[in-house]
Amino acid sequence: MTKSSDERLVKNAELAEKLSALHEQKTVMIASLNADTSPLISYAPFVEKEGAFYIFISYLAEHTPNLIERPQASVMLTADESTTANLFVRGRVRYEVECTVIERDNTLFDEVLVDLEQRQGKMVSLLRTLGDFYLIRLQPTMGSLVVGAGAAYRF
């Protein structure tokens, strides 16, 4: 391997580590569009499975009908403010996502909710009994990672 190949491998490993750290966050910020196309920002606890984010949210929450009726959104994970030296270049990853409802009779529904409860706690069991909650898959189609000043990457 050449020196530049080694440097690229090290850089890729560093980026993968930073991306992995962002994915350890327990909530994801969600940008969706209201019926009048005005933007709405919100958040939800999530779990990842097979390259997608899954959120379990009430239809009464303003963002839920947005994600169901206009199934394109952006989501973002950010580094913790308390561990960020310079908030102007706070580490973050943003994804454009396609949104799909996972029906309760789909075997994936039970699998994901088990994973979600392991990650987010017992509240998931209670929410599962409420009929107005929807499991929504947020499937990334493209992403953008910012790790510092002048250090942004699209993938």
Regions found by a protein language model. Name each.
Residues 1-155:
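Binding-site signature for planar aromatic cofactors or substrates
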